[in-house]
A protein has these predicted regions:
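Structural signal for interior beta-strand "rungs" in well-ordered beta-sheet cores
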Residues: 46-162
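Terminal amphipathic alpha-helical/low-complexity segments used for targeting or macromolecular assembly
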Residues: 1-47, 159
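Short glycine-/acidic-enriched loop or helix-start segments at secondary-structure transitions
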Residues: 28-30, 148, 164
Length: 165
């Protein structure tokens, strides 16, 4: 469509937006764009690929993007501006916070809590009942078997903290 200024030529009551910015690690750009347009009264549409399977009892907040082959089981809640990418599995009773990017092929076992502004890399696995703290990065292929503190970067099998911001 063009620049942010061009979008703002349209009344917030006349259009709904889709956030086209992805994530390769924790980046404020996607979150900032969402918040900037929300402050101006714009609404964001959910985008759900037709091959995604989402249980009836799932709660999706505004601006959620669910890609091809994703399965989300009953009792899950997905907060605003979150991406669940291709082929990821989100089992029962997971809570995924705002501005999260779940990369392709991630597995979240039942009851996992992912706090806001987290990036979970391709193919990572998080076992049941764990929490991933806010602003954390889970590296591709990691297997998480214990809670992750906020602002941490973890990698490996099993996942170990590399550093904390």
């Amino acid at each position: 469509i063009g620049s942010d200024e061009e979008v703002m030529r349209y009344s917030p009551q006349k259009i709904r937006l889709v956030n086209g910015i992805g994530s390769v690690r924790i980046s404020p750009l996607r979150r900032q764009l969402f918040k900037n347009f929300k402050c101006k009264g714009y609404q964001f549409e959910n985008v759900i690929h037709p091959s995604a399977i989402i249980a009836n009892e799932v709660i999706l907040s505004e601006g959620v993007q669910i890609m091809a082959g994703v399965i989300i089981q009953a009792g899950c809640q997905i907060e605003v501006n979150t991406i669940i990418n291709t082929g990821s599995l989100v089992d029962h009773d997971c809570l995924i916070g705002q501005h999260v990017h779940i990369a392709p092929g991630v597995v979240l076992s039942g009851g996992v809590v992912v706090d806001e502004n987290v990036h979970i890399g391709t193919g990572a696995v998080i076992i049941q009942g764990l929490r991933v703290g806010a602003n954390s990065l889970v590296a591709a292929g990691a297997v998480v078997i214990q809670n992750i503190l906020s602002d941490a970067t973890v990698a490996g099998i099993p996942a170990r903290e590399l550093y904390r911001n």
